[in-house]
Amino acid sequence: MASASRDQQRDLIARGLEAEVNKRAAVSLFDRFGPSNPLFKKQYADTRLSLRSYHSCSQTERVRASLELVNLTIETKNKERALLSKLNRGAVARVEKLCDAVADLREEFDLELDSLTAAQDDPVEGGPEPADVADTITEWRAEALPSVPAEDAP
């Protein structure tokens, strides 16, 4: 099946290329010799035939691809149904209870941790605690600036 599909795709590509080459040749012959020239008329007829062949092959390929998609969808949905039919609703309920218990314990832990850090919250390096984060950042920036020697006054 895969080999036939690959052959059909190759055939589609070949027919598409043939149609494009024939179109360019027809345009070139039209420009050189005009619409009443027998060489142009033959090329034009051949081009129309190759375009019909390409469109027919293209339509067949679209139908094949659609059927392949339908079969793949059926296979996927059957696998999904088989997996979902194994769902253990009791396990889901236990997981929900476990998640609730973990959330409650996490909340209690965070409250205890907050109260512990609030009790131990001493100002850094013994100085007064800054009132604003922006002030702290400004202080740290000023501390990081390089020192500049003072100039002697004349």
UniProtKB/Swiss-Prot annotation:
InterPro entries: DUF848. Residues 116-137 are annotated as: Disordered. Belongs to the herpesviridae UL96 family. This is Gene 35 protein. It comes from Equine herpesvirus 2 (strain 86/87). The gene is 35.
